[in-house]
């Protein structure tokens, strides 16, 4: 077990608690550590984390993109964030994180955590999300081709994709991908995004 903790006051306490066990404590910020070095001792890892809500989504997406050694995650995040991470079309909660997570793995909300289990009590509910990495992406396109389209469309999510993607794909290209140019992004599944990426 390797634990990453950025609270400098907590690190010595953790080291004392786990002394004599097969646990190493790395002092640092999970957004800045060199994951290649931290995880060098084994080829595959499972990540379990109670993530600060303000960094949860970018950190999860960074780990999915950059740290293939992490094959599975169980993370606690704000409930609404959990819904977005696991959403699939045509769920109204779907957004940029939903599509990017689906490219890398399968996500599901596996438990809801009420504020009463924390002290002090937060104002929001939390949830546990499990993400299992795909051995290969389910669409035959690169993230570099797919992500700009997803971001462009969801940054103008109320617009039809023929408008939001107008600088990236022509109406003819959208139609050739088998996608309705008048569709809005939340109606498109990952397969449709894959076809658009390769159009």
Annotate each language-model stretch with its function.
Residues 37, 166, 175, 194, ...:
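SAM-dependent transferase fold signal centered on methyltransferase-like domains
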